[in-house]
């Protein structure tokens, strides 16, 4: 959950990691040339190997552990991985029309790791991809929101009335109400907006 850390902490961690990594590489170089690197550099090497192992294991097993112990998700951020289906209701009106667009069947695919998240939305006419994401947890009320900016690419056959565009959106989970439902809203540079209501295709093993 790297994105949940304050920016100052991120900078400090990156800086410290860079120093430790450089020292560890120097220790390896000295070791393989038969010279003594000294205790500090060997310590940096050990820390680097240990940290890399922890990160690797966390990437593999964090969400499995969080599934068994849901409390972990309420203290970090819920596991949003999966395929979500539902309806998008838009204020968009086709050129020359005053009639709002009818509800659109929508599929959202979320891929989340400890360090990253990506969101893809697919409808019958277009596909959008997230390009920047931001986690916004409300731990007190157990509401979890992810904001993201996106680029939308309509299929060629629909571009006469729906041009490529960019926008920003959020998806929100109310942990106490339904862990397999997301609601949200989007705004785009065409001046339209809309609401999303999605349900996760549930794995029988998921709690």
Where are these regions (language model features)?
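Central antiparallel beta-sheet cores of small beta-barrel/beta-sandwich binding domains
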Residues: 3-5, 70-207
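Amphipathic/hydrophobic helical signal segments and adjacent flexible N-terminal regions
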Residues: 1-79, 89-93, 202-207
């Amino acid at each position: 959950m790297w994105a949940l850390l304050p920016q100052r902490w991120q900078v400090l961690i990156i800086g410290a990691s860079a120093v430790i990594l450089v020292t560890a590489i120097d220790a390896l170089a000295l070791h393989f040339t038969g010279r003594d690197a000294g205790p500090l550099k060997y310590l940096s090497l050990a820390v680097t190997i240990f940290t890399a192992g922890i990160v690797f294991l966390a990437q593999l097993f964090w969400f499995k552990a969080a599934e068994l112990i849901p409390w972990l998700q309420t203290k970090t951020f819920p596991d949003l991985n999966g395929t979500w289906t539902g309806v998008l209701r838009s204020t968009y009106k086709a050129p020359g029309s005053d009639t709002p667009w009818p509800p659109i069947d929508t599929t959202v695919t979320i891929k989340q790791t400890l360090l990253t998240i990506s969101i893809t939305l697919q409808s019958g006419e277009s596909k959008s991809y997230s390009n920047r994401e931001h986690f916004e947890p409300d731990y007190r009320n157990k509401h979890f929101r992810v904001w993201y900016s996106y680029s939308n690419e309509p299929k060629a056959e629909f571009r006469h009335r729906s041009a490529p565009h960019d926008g920003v959106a959020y998806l929100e989970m109310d942990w106490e109400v339904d862990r397999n439902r997301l609601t949200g809203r989007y705004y785009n540079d065409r001046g339209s907006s809309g609401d999303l209501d999605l349900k996760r295709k549930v794995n029988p093993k998921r709690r």
